[in-house]
């Protein structure tokens, strides 16, 4: 990292030449994050289960002349995560940024929620983020440098009246506390750990929702009256992934169109 006194303002937000891992990168927010990092000059490993989708993302990234590694990975499988991190360290030489984005959402009334659904939510949304942070953390501790950006949700602090999101909100609350605990543990090691709390954003999952009452609830509940667009999270991600946030750690950055202020 450049010395603070030598840096110009544009350098603070630069990720040029940095090496990043983005999980859940085959679609939605993860895809946007990976392409954004590449556009800004970072080398990127893209991880997800759907290899064919990752190859499509790689075609977009290749336009920017950076190194891109496609890494098939199920974040509930620790051996696959270890293999991804080992490959990234070998191919990149170091790992500067982890965008811990992979997640799933199963919405159902609590009394109807099956054990399998609960375990799937926990395995993906909590365990997967922890396993990736743990393995990447081993590399970052050797470097005495790293930026970990967990993707949580505004549902870690509020919920939506009448919507059965107990399991989902529980996992995102866990991500917030995991972020704080890791940030405190690694604060003196040059590693920052923060979490972004998106509100309702356009995604593959949201596109499948056809309940107008539900959509109306989102529009009426959000002061901006709409869902966010994936690109509207890129600024927050770049801030936390760059040296602009070098004195920021353990924080929740809400990007929710004002949902949590009312």
Question: For the regions a protein language model found, what residue spans apply to each?
Answer:
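A conserved structural motif in NAD(P)-dependent oxidoreductases
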Residues: 222-233, 244
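Residue(s) in the substrate-gating loop at a strand-loop-helix junction
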Residues: 153
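Alpha-helical segment proximal to the catalytic Tyr-Lys
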Residues: 138, 184-188, 246
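Active-site helix of classical SDR
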Residues: 133, 171, 179
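Short C-terminal tail/terminal secondary-structure segment
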Residues: 6-14, 238, 249-262
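Conserved glycine-rich cofactor-binding loop
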Residues: 26-27
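Substrate-binding pocket helix/loop in short-chain dehydrogenase/reductase
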Residues: 109-110, 114-122, 164, 206, ...
């Amino acid at each position: 990292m450049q010395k603070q006194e030598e840096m110009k303002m544009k350098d603070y937000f630069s990720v040029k030449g940095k090496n990043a891992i983005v999980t859940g990168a085959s679609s939605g927010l993860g895809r946007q994050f990976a392409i954004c990092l590449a556009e800004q000059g970072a080398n990127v490993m893209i991880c997800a289960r759907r290899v064919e989708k990752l190859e499509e993302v790689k075609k977009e990234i290749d336009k920017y002349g950076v190194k891109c590694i496609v890494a098939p990975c199920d974040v509930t499988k620790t051996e696959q995560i270890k293999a991804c991190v080992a490959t990234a360290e070998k191919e990149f030489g170091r790992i500067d940024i982890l965008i811990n984005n992979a997640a799933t959402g199963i919405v159902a009334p609590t009394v109807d929620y099956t054990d399998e659904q609960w375990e799937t939510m926990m395995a993906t949304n909590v365990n997967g983020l922890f396993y990736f942070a743990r393995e990447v953390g081993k590399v970052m501790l050797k470097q005495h440098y790293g930026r970990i950006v967990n993707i949580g949700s505004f549902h870690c602090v509020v919920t939506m009246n009448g919507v059965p999101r107990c399991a989902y909100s529980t996992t995102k609350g866990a991500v917030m506390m995991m972020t704080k605990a890791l940030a405190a543990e690694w604060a003196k090691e040059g590693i920052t750990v923060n979490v972004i709390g998106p509100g309702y954003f356009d995604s593959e999952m949201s596109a499948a929702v056809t309940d107008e009452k539900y959509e109306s609830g989102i529009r009426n509940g959000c002061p901006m009256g709409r869902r966010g667009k994936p690109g509207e999270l890129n600024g927050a991600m770049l801030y936390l992934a760059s040296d602009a946030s070098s004195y920021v750690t353990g924080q929740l950055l809400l990007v929710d169109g004002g949902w949590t202020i009312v």
